[in-house]
Amino acid sequence: MMSAMETNMVLILTIFYNAYFLLAISSQLLLLYLMLKCQNRSLHEMRIYLFNILGLQFISTFSAFVLQCRLKRVTLKHFCRIVPSSGTVAMLCYGPCKYLGNIVCEVLFHILQTSLIACATALIIAFYYRYEMLTNNSFTRSGHYKQLVISYCVPLVFLICEVLSPNDVNKLVAELTVLHPTYGLENYAILGFSDVKTVAASSQTLMLMIGLYGTPFIALVFRKKIIKILHSSRSYHAEKIVQTKSMIQGLTLQTLLPLICYCPGFTYYIYSQYTQSSSLFVEFAVSPYGFVYTIFDPLLTIYYVLPYRRTFKAIFSKHNSTTSATFVHSETARRVA
């Protein structure tokens, strides 16, 4: 049975995840609308990479939400807290997925993790595309697809390592019962890794660390190269320089966001494994941060991709003009009457 503190934390986190889901989907749908509405020629090929990133964010958001249709209320169906134990790590999933069994929750967890890793590689190939366009000024359609295929190789290897990692649920439950007797385990779907010291599990952790800290570093290297090219060349139109600089600034921030969001949870995971300590409050506090960036990522794209920002402003200005015209017309009609 849950303690009073655990019950309150579950309630708070449920409210948080509902708000997160609505905000994330709203920002993603807004970006999708602008991408479909804005037909700027300069973004014709770049849209391939932006659609790829947005699609992965849809997957990472909906993968925790897709089974909700079997319930009557709106709730995010898959959220986890990481619980440390001796040589293992367990995810306690509280949501409708628990009614469908551990296999469903495990599949959803793999989809979440893999799609988030894929988002990082998608940002890197977007940087590479901009760099190639400035240096060679050409990129074939087959080149785009080749880039996309290569970008999914890393997430695929990560997924294989994750699937091959030992996940003896009975061992996890037995260990959790002994080490954390106050946890209401009957209220969760429990999954995780029963031995984090195997080659597969260690490789997965190493790939997480490289992805977490390496992606921003690679992005900053490409950013420096691109800015240097823009400053040294006089053949580019001023508008193209401004637009490229703004887009690169946005992509840079997008690669830094996951680092900021993942750091609390990943740092706690590493700390707990080495110290063999845990905190119920910290487990709940750090669990949501890994997904929060999917709220802000589309907004950064809207702001820093200038054609999308201008399209958004044009729609907003048109709406205000229509509202003002309607008000003036009705006010004039009232006075005449």
UniProtKB/Swiss-Prot annotation:
Disulphide bonds in the chain: none
TM region(s), chain numbering: 10-30, 48-68, 107-127, 147-167, 202-222, 250-270, 280-300
InterPro entries listed in its UniProt record: 7TM_GPCR_serpentine_rcpt_Srd, Nematode_rcpt-like_delta
Main subcellular location: membrane
Keywords for the protein's UniProt record, in alphabetical order: Membrane, Transmembrane, Transmembrane helix
A Gene Ontology cellular-component term: membrane
Name of protein: Serpentine receptor class delta-50
Mode of membrane association: Multi-pass membrane protein
Subcellular location: Membrane
Keyword tRNA-binding: no
Protein family membership: Belongs to the nematode receptor-like protein srd family.
